[in-house]
């Protein structure tokens, strides 16, 4: 297929976004001779590995084999849902080998690597998922060594676990930890989601929304500075101000903790002097960018009413009816949010979140689709 237009490389960087959009539009509208669209799974900007994989499955005749090496984000990212559906519902996805980013399977490639094996035509009933794998488990005789960790995903349970998105959970290597993750998934899969208006906390009929912090740290950098006692400005909360101490998550900011060392990173970029004002009420916030090596992924904390939030922090926009319900039950909105934060920081929900995480960003979609059981339904995961 020849794409129309002038695709000269002599363009300024400001034009690249428009070029990508035009390329995406043309590829999405590319049709076969019978009028059907050639690519059914393209969403947003063109992603070459998705395009190559879909085209490969089209070109190989039924019962032929397709093997491809792609980023392992395909297993869980939202934008790959249409491609996973095609692999499951119209083809036989037989195996996947997942190598996490720390294995450095290819020199210079820092992201995780996934090896897919697909038989074209038919549909998938069972897929054997190997991982997390180590580079030393690759075998020149059999592909993988016999003791490589794996799990079999069967269609009935897989459908329930993912609500038809066909994501593949990220599993730990340790057998005991794997059982804990599977137990958490099985216990939570049928629970209502946080953003569903039918959940136990929300009688309003209005969904709980997840919002990104109001201050873009790049665009407003001139209005963000080091915290200085007595200086003009209000507290600026970003991801680094979330502190974990045991099982407790709290905000560690010099405006609320005078013992923070003068050289501490919590003091840098901690003061806001721009025109956007604090919301005037406490909020329940979650760190949006996490270190993959941390034991915990979900880090919820209540932020005070006199601060603003950076875009490395997400927060819940709760309907008035939910806030009133929390205040009535716990004495105040602030105390109610503290109770809710402890619930959302439960071990069970964190196991779920780590299993389905696509990357190091805790995005709005992930939080909105988080299972939301009642507190009495949360229990310790042990095997």
Name these PLM-found stretches:
Residues 26-41:
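Short glycine/proline-rich turn/loop motifs
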Residues 79-96:
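Conserved Class I S-adenosyl-L-methionine
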Residues 70-75, 102:
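Conserved short loop/turn motifs at secondary-structure junctions
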Residues 1-7, 11:
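Single conserved hydrophobic/aromatic residue that forms the stacking wall/gate
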Residues 129-131, 142:
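Trafficking entry modules
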Residues 37, 46, 50-53, 57-60, ...:
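Polybasic, glycine- and aromatic-enriched phosphate-binding surface used to engage nucleic acids
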Residues 74-82, 379-381:
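Catalytic palm subdomain of template-directed nucleic-acid polymerases
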Residues 9-28:
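Flexible glycine-rich, low-complexity coil/linker segments exposed to the extracellular/periplasmic environment
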